[in-house]
Design a protein with these regions (language model features):
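Residue register of alpha-helical TPR repeats
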Residues: 2, 31, 38, 68-70, ...
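Alpha-helical segment of the N-proximal tetratricopeptide repeat
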Residues: 2-23
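Residue-level signature for tetratricopeptide repeat
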Residues: 10, 39, 78, 118, ...
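Structural motif corresponding to the intra-repeat A-B loop/turn of tetratricopeptide repeats
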Residues: 14, 43, 82, 102, ...
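TPR-repeat structural position
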Residues: 17-18, 46, 85, 105, ...
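Amphipathic alpha-helical segments of tetratricopeptide repeats
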Residues: 21, 28, 54-60, 93-103, ...
Length: 161
């Protein structure tokens, strides 16, 4: 990873999408496109974000399966935020499997949580509970653990009806 990509990724992680865009706005390589897509999503331009993430995923080579999978997860998150529940769940499952296979536990867990949230939105409580049961929240950072507990609470609330 070159220094501009690293700096842009750190800016995004620190909540500075404009700083990230400053570093990669004119670049067309797949890592830059992916970071631009994430930055645009953080800024609320979801259509452009999806397009950039798709271009990035197509641009990553066969040896960059993890990068492609991360793009799929990011695109799935955008679809969920947009309430586009018709996005391909199989693509998210495949991305999650790839991430798990390559040891990216954090992004694999995030993909699992996205699947759970989608299943909750479409009313498939049993499936959501099954997926959630397979996710271990302990090694996750606090924000991801909180998302896990919110999903558990969401299932419990729907079961009360």
């Amino acid at each position: 990873m070159d220094s501009l990509i690293t700096a842009a990724a750190l800016a995004l992680a620190g909540g500075d999408p404009l700083g990230a865009l400053d570093r990669v706005a004119l670049r067309e390589d797949p890592p830059a496109l992916a970071l631009r897509g994430i930055a645009m999503a953080q800024l609320g331009d979801l259509d452009r974000a999806k397009a950039l993430l798709r271009r990035a995923a197509r641009g990553f080579g066969p040896k960059e399966a993890v990068a492609r999978a991360r793009c799929v997860v990011a695109e799935a998150e955008i679809a969920l935020v947009s309430r586009d529940l018709g996005w391909p769940a199989k693509a998210l499952d495949a991305a999650r499997a790839t991430l798990e296979k390559h040891g990216d536990r954090l992004n694999a867990a995030h993909a699992g949580h996205l699947k759970v949230r989608r299943l909750l939105l479409i009313g498939r409580l049993d499936e959501a509970e099954d997926v959630l049961g397979g996710l271990d929240p302990m090694p996750l950072p606090p924000a991801s653990r909180a998302a896990h507990e919110l999903a558990v609470a969401g299932i419990a609330m729907r079961r009360l009806k």
